[in-house]
Swiss-Prot record:
Annotated a 1,2-diacyl-sn-glycero-3-phospho-(1D-myo-inositol-3,5-bisphosphate) binding sites: N377, N402, I403, S464, D465, G466, W467, D468, R469, K505, R509
Broad EC category: hydrolase
Name of the protein described by the UniProt record: Phosphatidylinositol-3,5-bisphosphate 3-phosphatase MTMR3
Name of the gene: mtm-3
Comp. bias regions, Low complexity: 1-10, 890-901, 913-926
GO molecular function (one): phosphatidylinositol-3,5-bisphosphate phosphatase activity
Feature: compositional bias, Basic and acidic residues: 18-29, 933-954, 976-985
Organism: Caenorhabditis elegans
Length: 1006
């Protein structure tokens, strides 16, 4: 076919002039890179071609190329590339959450960075690091927008991220303009998500839109609202995500659960005095109080405590009846005020724990502050209790650090982990942070509280406001004492009631205050410190906790992610008001990490263990930093402690060295806390954000070429690619030990299921077979009744071991066994020959040979076989006859009687010839004849018997009296013990008795 074409198009420079000067018909040229354009525009060509315009200008940047794809028909829209330097608009396959949308950056949904790309949504920042050789996404990094604590722009093209959960990262861009553009968008989101809670809910949070291409984050709100709206819509359409439970699966009222479980109805009651949050705005709607306290008493006593947080009962020891209470500091003031109603509430609660007739135990008041701090608060109408006003009271000061000291130590440990100095200074740097020391003090005081309760002392715990250190101490003590709170369901109720319902300021503790929104910074990782303390207990005693390490990590991440509504408010009151204004609902995290999710259930949990935890070493030397949370999820623990010069640097890295260069552009002023620390600790120093001093191109060879494969693998993620992102949109934590245990348990459960199905199939077939086959036609021989044929030497060895003195009294060896029978010889019970259960099968008495059932042959007698005592089955009739001691025969008469009986029995068996060396082939219908050992089987000389009497060799004629079982299995002679009568209960093993038939060997007197 001939194609009319125009002049050839030049698609690249080269020697020999322009390709357009050549003719299309010139097929002899080796350079076939030119592609002709057809003159007929409606003609469909079979190859791709490129139309280059503005080529004559001589500038590559101004030239444009139009790519016409395979089988192109003229008139189709072309693919145009203006410049080879222009970034392509492609999207990495990352599954978005319900309600999640990508925000365009410079009209691109995926923005290029050094070593990969990133994209931003209304929930998170996703960084994709790729392999340049294979263009494969090797690693994904996820940063929830609400988790960002600080975002800084650094010269030449860096963005530093500090996260509230403790991680720090540096993103490297190709140009400074790209870094500034992304920083502007992220900083707007940072401002929007750190507004005071009072200014957030003036409009509907669901109104976020990404249509504003200049800055799509100008109307951003917490993603939890958009996520909940999308999930509710999917639920109505029947398309709820499989990893989420329905909303009604989470109990709304949890106070009654503990009240009923602990049996508190006798002395306590649930009060609804705070139903509308009028008494205390930070307390839950329902509170447990003593029965002797009325609602009016609570209203009168609440103002005496700071913010109205009066003493409330939160737990009771079922063993000692001791009560655990919580409150805020009393309003004592300089004049030492007192309140009789407050004293009455405490007295009634303590009275319920005292047992009449026993010695009264002391009432312990644990003030989480130090004495100096508590005394200084008296100037602000605060203070501590006067023990003279409370019966048998004792006051203890715990000296735990306040939120500012906790925040300072957390910042120090975060900086230390991501900006390590020489390895020899590691322990010194860690000690300087004070983080592990604070953690140890918290665990020690919680253990002391648990010890008081276990000894029967009722305890009241409070600090200044009663929602930070108070919550930490009380919840840790409850975990140490009550096994229920160490389960997934119990730990969920503990968080929901003691932390969320009792008003821990979860939102304010993660809020970054800046600008004109307030001078006081209340952010502090109090909840994160509590989770790390629980992690230490779990690491010390892993079998006592039903939830896994991954469960705690997921809680820590979503406490700051903004995905779930569980941690977005300071109290129940704020959540209720926000939901009323927004007319929406929120998804709780418990719909995701409940006990229904096997990933968060410990496979080695000991569910039978009850009571308090075993003694735990809580000293500083036994603690370690929670690296899985504070550092990168996919870094191995060894990377943090490796030399800096051996660490690979990529497009998104952890800062490696500290720099004081002025190139760092701070987007917010450095933090400086100069307020008085009443606990006596030092001022909190301002934090300088670390930077990277070199660009990625300068460090491409930072990993030595001689590094082994094992060393290089330390820097690789455990899970490569998009599989590292979990269903909730954050990086998955891989617990290899739990994964292995889950696999083993699944295989075990599958094996049990298959065996159950097999048993059920056998039962079904047995029922069908019973209905089809008559009892007279059924013939079955148990495998236990079949024995392999032994040699003559072994038989003769058994014969030589016969000791007539030790034979059983009144024992009648049988030569004929009853054949197959459909019922028991005594109780006439029908047998099921296909049943796998011993109770439904037939058995033979090893004395008389009758066919009996399990119920009629529960007794056993003992014999000696090969020097070992073996239990044999006996029917009830034979067993009773064995107890007739008056019929006991002498050893000689027993031997004679046994021999004569054998001769008489053998003479009556069809086909048996005592004078012949051959086996008779006459087989009756109901009996199988005995088999006589032929003379050729004794080719080897018969060994001398190992008898004490040193008998001579057995004569040749003896072989005629060595008989075998009617079922063609050779019978061994039994040597019986002197004490043969032994009864075993029904639970003993009957398998041995089933498999060992009595082998009768009788010696003919010569």
């Amino acid at each position: 076919m001939t194609v009319t074409s125009s002049a050839a198009i030049d698609i690249g420079g080269g020697g020999g002039g322009r390709r357009s000067d050549r003719l299309d018909s010139d097929r002899t040229s080796e350079d076939m890179s030119f592609i002709a354009s057809p003159a007929n525009e409606s003609f469909q060509i079979g190859a791709s071609f490129v139309d280059v315009q503005n080529e004559s200008s001589g500038s590559i940047d101004t030239a444009t190329a139009t790519l016409h794809e395979l089988n192109y028909t003229f008139g189709m829209p072309p693919v145009t590339e203006e410049s080879e330097n222009m970034p392509q608009n492609y999207e990495t396959v990352v599954e978005l959450l319900p309600g999640e949308e990508r925000a365009p950056i410079n009209k691109l949904t995926e923005f290029p960075i050094e070593g990969g790309s990133l994209f931003v949504t209304n929930f998170r920042i996703v960084v994709i690091l790729k392999d340049k050789e294979v263009e494969e996404a090797l690693r994904f990094l996820v940063f929830p927008l609400q988790d960002i604590e600080q975002i800084d722009l650094a010269i030449p093209a860096f963005i530093h991220l500090s996260l509230k959960i403790g991680r720090m990262f540096t993103i490297c861009f190709k140009t400074a303009e790209d870094a500034a553009l992304v920083h502007k968008i992220l900083y707007t989101a940072f401002q929007r998500l750190n507004r005071p809670i009072s200014s957030i809910y003036t409009s509907r949070p669901q109104d976020w839109t990404s249509k504003n291409t200049d800055n799509p984050m100008q109307s951003l709100n917490a993603f939890a609202w958009k996520f909940s709206e999308a999930v509710d819509e999917l639920d109505r359409d029947g398309k709820l995500p499989s990893w989420l439970l329905r909303a009604d699966s989470v109990a709304q009222e949890i106070t009654h659960i503990d009240f009923n479980r602990l049996g508190m109805s006798e002395h306590f009651q649930i009060s609804s005095v705070n139903e509308n949050f009028e008494v205390c705005p930070t307390y839950p709607e329902k509170i447990i109080v003593p029965k002797g306290i009325t609602d009016d008493d609570i209203r009168k006593g609440a103002p005496y405590r700071s913010i109205g947080r009066f003493p409330a009962v939160i737990w009771r020891c079922r063993k000692t009846r001791a009560v655990l209470m919580r409150s805020s500091q009393p309003q004592v003031g300089i004049l030492s005020w007192r309140n009789p109603t407050d004293e009455k509430i405490i007295e009634e609660a303590v009275k319920a724990s005292r047992i009449e007739g026993e010695e009264k135990k002391q009432f312990i008041i644990m003030d989480a502050r130090g004495y100096t701090s508590a005394f200084a608060n008296r100037a602000r109408s605060g203070g501590f209790e006067n023990t003279e006003y409370y019966q048998q009271a004792k006051l203890e000061f715990l000296g735990l650090p306040n939120i500012h000291a906790v925040r300072g130590s957390f910042n120090n440990v975060r900086t230390m982990l991501h900006n390590l100095g020489p390895n020899e200074q590691l322990l010194t740097s860690l000690q300087t942070t004070g983080w592990l020391l604070n953690l140890s003090n918290l665990l020690v005081n919680a253990a002391n509280c648990a010890d008081h309760l276990s000894k029967g002392h009722s305890v009241l715990v409070h600090c200044s406001d009663g929602w930070d250190r108070t919550t930490q101490v009380t919840t840790l003590a409850k975990i140490m004492l009550d096994e229920y709170y160490r389960t997934v369901k119990g730990f969920e109720e503990l968080i929901r009631r003691d932390w969320i319902a009792f008003g821990h300021k979860l939102y304010d503790r993660q809020l970054v205050a800046f600008g004109n929104w307030g001078t006081s910074d209340e952010r502090s990782p109090v909840f994160l410190q509590f989770l790390e303390a629980v992690r230490h207990l779990q690491r010390e005693q892993p079998t006592l906790f039903q939830f896994t390490h991954a469960y705690l990590i997921k809680l820590a991440k979503h406490a700051y992610s903004g995905l779930f509504g569980s941690f977005l408010f300071n109290s129940h009151k704020e959540r209720r008001e926000a939901m009323e204004k927004c007319k929406g609902t929120l998804v709780d995290i418990w719909r995701f990490i409940g006990p229904h999710n096997e990933e968060y259930v410990n496979q080695s949990f000991d569910e039978h263990y009850t009571g308090a935890v075993k003694p735990v070493n809580v000293s500083v030397i036994n603690l370690r930093v929670w690296h899985e949370v504070f550092a990168d999820e996919e870094e191995h623990y060894t990377q943090i402690f490796s030399p800096k010069e051996e660490r690979p640097l990529s497009g998104c890295t952890t800062p490696m060295n500290t720099s004081t260069s002025t190139n760092l552009v701070k987007s917010k002023s450095s933090e400086s806390i100069n307020s008085l620390n009443v606990d006596g600790s030092a001022k909190e120093s301002s934090q300088q954000h670390p930077t990277c001093s070199t660009t990625p191109s300068d460090n491409t060879n930072s990993l030595p070429m001689s590094t082994s494969f094992i060393q290089q693998s330390l820097y690789q993620p455990k899970v490569r690619g998009v599989a590292a992102i979990d269903r909730d949109g954050v990086i998955r934590f891989e617990d290899d030990e739990q994964a292995m245990l889950r696999k083993k348990n699944k295989l075990r459960a599958e094996e049990i299921r298959r065996k159950d199905e097999k048993i059920e199939e056998l039962r079904r077939r047995a029922v069908l077979d019973t209905n089809k086959v008559s009892p007279g036609q059924r013939q079955s021989y148990s495998e236990s009744d079949v024995e392999t044929t032994g040699t003559l030497e072994r038989v003769m060895s058994d014969v030589s071991m016969v000791d007539p003195v030790n034979e059983l009294p009144h024992f009648k060896p049988n030569t004929t066994w009853e054949g197959e029978s459909g019922h028991c010889a005594y109780c006439k019970k029908e047998f099921n020959k296909l049943s796998v259960y011993v109770e439904d099968r037939q058995h033979h008495c090893r004395n008389c040979g009758r066919v009996v059932c399990e119920d009629c042959s529960k007794n056993r007698f003992s014999v000696i076989e090969e020097g070992k005592s073996v239990q044999k089955r006996a029917c009830d009739s034979c067993y009773d006859s064995m107890h007739e001691t008056d019929l006991k025969l002498s050893s000689s008469s027993t031997t004679t009687t046994s021999s004569s009986t054998k001769i008489e029995n053998d003479s009556n068996v069809p086909g048996l010839d005592n004078n012949s060396d051959n086996v008779s082939e006459n087989v009756s219908e109901n009996a199988i004849p005995d088999i006589i050992v032929e003379e050729k089987e004794a080719e080897d000389p018969i060994k001398e018997a190992e008898s004490p009497s040193k008998e001579t060799k057995c004569p040749k004629t003896l072989r005629n009296f060595i008989s075998f079982s009617p079922k063609s299995s050779m019978r061994k002679n039994k040597v019986h013990s002197r004490d043969p009568l032994k009864s075993i209960d029904e639970g003993s093993s009957s398998q041995q008795a089933e498999s060992d038939d009595v082998l009768d060997v009788n010696e003919q007197p010569l």
